[in-house]
Amino acid sequence: PKKGRETSAPPDPLESLRILRDRALVELLYGTGIRVGELVALDVRDIDLRRAEVRVMGKGRKERVVPLYPGIVERLRFYIREARPLLAAKADQRRAGPRALFLNARGKPLTRQGYWVVLRKAAAASGVAGHVTPHTLRHSFATHLLRGGASLRHVQELLGHATIATTQIYTHLTSDQVHKVFESAHPRA
C-alpha cells in the first residue's frame, strides 16, 4: 500500500457468523416472548420452520408451542443453514455435534450470560438508551400483543404463565388508551 493509506483488514468470517446468530437470537426472543433460559435451552429439533413454530420447555417442565412470524422463520432458516454448521464445526470433534440451536464462537451451547452480552451489544449498536434486559424484550412482546388486541388468555398461553394474574402485570394501559376505548365503546360517551 502507498504511504499514508490505511489498509482495511479483511472481514472476520467468525464475526459474520456471530452477526447472523445474534440477529436470530434477538429477533427470536422479542418475536416469541420466551424467557432467556428457554431460549438458550432450545435444540435444533425444537424449531419447525415448515410449520413456523417453536416448541419451548417452560417452567415446571411444561411444554408449549409458540408461533413464529415470517421474518423470524427466514432469519432462523438462514442462521441454521449458513452460520450454525460453521459454528458447530468449531466444537470438539471427538464428541457428537452439539444439538443446541444457538452456539458460541467455540461451537458450544450459548449460555444465559452469553446472551446478555449479545443483547447489550445489539442495544448499543441500535442506539437504544437505557438498560435493556432479556425481560425487556419479553415485556415488549406481551405489551405489543395486548395493545394489538390479543386476549389476556392468549398472551398467558404464549408466555407460559401458570396463572392469569402473572400475565396481568402486562396490562398497564395508558390513560389515552383507556379514554379512547371508553369513548368508542360506551353508549353515552
Feature-to-residue mapping (PLM):
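Conserved catalytic core of the tyrosine transesterase superfamily
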Residues: 1-189
